[in-house]
C-alpha cells in the first residue's frame, strides 16, 4: 500500500474506532472488545470519513462511497494487513500509524533536511 493509502487507511480506522467507542458508551449491551473485531459501520462512519478533508483532497474517488463499500474497505484492511498480533481496530491502526511514522522518519524528514541544506547553500553563494 502506498504511503498516501496508508494515511487514508489510518484515518478510516481512527474514525471507525472512535465510533465504536461512542456506541459502546451509549449502549451497555454492546461489548467494545467485540466491536473492535466486528465494527458497526453506519452512516456516521461513512459521513465522517467521506467528508473528511484528507479524503476530499487526497482520495476524492472515495468520497461517494456508501456503507457497504466502507465495510468492504475495513474488511480488506483486516484481511490484507500483515501483522503478527491479533487483528482488531486498535492493532490495525497502530500498524498504519507505525508505517506513517517510519515513512516520515526514513524518507520525508531526510528529504526536507536535504532541501533545507540545498536552499542554504544557494543563499550562501
From Swiss-Prot:
GO CC terms, sorted: nucleus
Q: Where in the cell is it found?
A: Nucleus
Q: Major location, coarse class? A: nucleus
Any Pfam family from its record, for instance, is SWC7
GO terms, biological process: chromatin organization
Function (record text) = Component of the SWR1 complex which mediates the ATP-dependent exchange of histone H2A for the H2A variant HZT1 leading to transcriptional regulation of selected genes by chromatin remodeling.
Quaternary structure per UniProt? Component of the SWR1 chromatin remodeling complex.
Q: State the family it belongs to.
A: Belongs to the SWC7 family.
The name this protein carries in UniProt is SWR1-complex protein 7
Organism in which the protein naturally occurs: Kluyveromyces lactis (strain ATCC 8585 / CBS 2359 / DSM 70799 / NBRC 1267 / NRRL Y-1140 / WM37)
- What broad taxonomic lineage does this protein's source fall under? Eukaryota, Fungi, Dikarya, Ascomycota, Saccharomycotina
